[in-house]
């Protein structure tokens, strides 16, 4: 059972609709998703989902926001736990990879979306979307480390993109079903990130 999968009751219908919707899209595609079908799956009236989502696009946005919010919360926990430690970036990277490793359905849903926005600029925007918040945690902490290491401002953006590419690529490899690997991914992911997370001033 995946880490964040829960037993739902109608008192938490919004979250149940989101989780069921993610399952439907991953299994049969977005075109098969409807609020009426989700109501049936959740055992509630056809009108119940409209309390939370006026239309299908509202539900789709909420699904993405829901996943990124959970990831942001996990990254924030890691940041607080390892704050001021030299291996903070490694731990954050591991948290990112293992979050999707333990929640395949979230990963498959996110990569199927074409409306996810990630701000790769070195400047920090005031956007409040949860996908921006999750990435901003990685970006803020990486920037602190890079600046402390004497990395030039011009190079910081490139290094942040490279770091994100690393964890995103690792997540893809770990989740891909036809890749065989005998060792523990949880241990190996941290070792891999540590091996390439060497900050050199530019």
Model-inferred region functions:
Residues 16, 20, 24-58, 62:
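Helix-turn-helix
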Residues 75-76, 121-147, 157-161, 187-198:
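Amphipathic alpha-helical packing segments from all-alpha helical-bundle domains
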Residues 65-91, 108, 122, 128, ...:
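Amphipathic alpha-helical linker/stalk segments
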Residues 102, 140, 144, 163-182, ...:
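Amphipathic C-terminal alpha-helical segment
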Residues 1-12:
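N-terminal intrinsically disordered/low-complexity leader segments
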Residues 102-122, 172-180:
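Amphipathic alpha-helical segments used for helix-helix packing
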Residues 62, 76-105, 153, 160-163:
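Hydrophobic alpha-helical connector segments
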Residues 13-22, 38, 63-71, 75, ...:
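Generic hydrophobic, amphipathic alpha-helix propensity
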């Amino acid at each position: 059972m995946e880490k964040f999968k829960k037993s739902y009751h109608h008192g938490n219908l919004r979250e149940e609709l989101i989780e069921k919707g993610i399952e439907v899209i991953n299994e049969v595609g977005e075109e098969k998703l409807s609020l009426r079908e989700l109501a049936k799956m959740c055992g509630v009236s056809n009108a119940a989902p409209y309390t939370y989502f006026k239309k299908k696009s509202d539900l789709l946005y909420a699904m993405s926001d829901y996943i990124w919010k959970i990831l942001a919360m996990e990254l924030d926990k890691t940041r607080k736990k390892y704050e001021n430690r030299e291996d903070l970036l490694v731990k954050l990277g591991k948290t990112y990879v293992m979050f999707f490793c333990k929640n395949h359905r979230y990963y498959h849903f996110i990569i199927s979306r074409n409306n996810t926005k990630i701000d790769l600029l070195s400047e920090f925007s005031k956007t409040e979307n949860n996908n921006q918040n999750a990435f901003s945690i990685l970006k803020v902490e990486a920037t602190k480390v890079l600046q402390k290491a004497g990395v030039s401002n011009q190079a910081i953006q490139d290094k942040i993109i490279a770091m994100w590419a690393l964890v995103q690529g690792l997540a893809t490899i770990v989740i891909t079903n036809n890749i065989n690997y005998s060792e523990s991914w949880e241990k190996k992911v941290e070792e891999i990130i540590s091996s390439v997370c060497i900050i050199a001033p530019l």
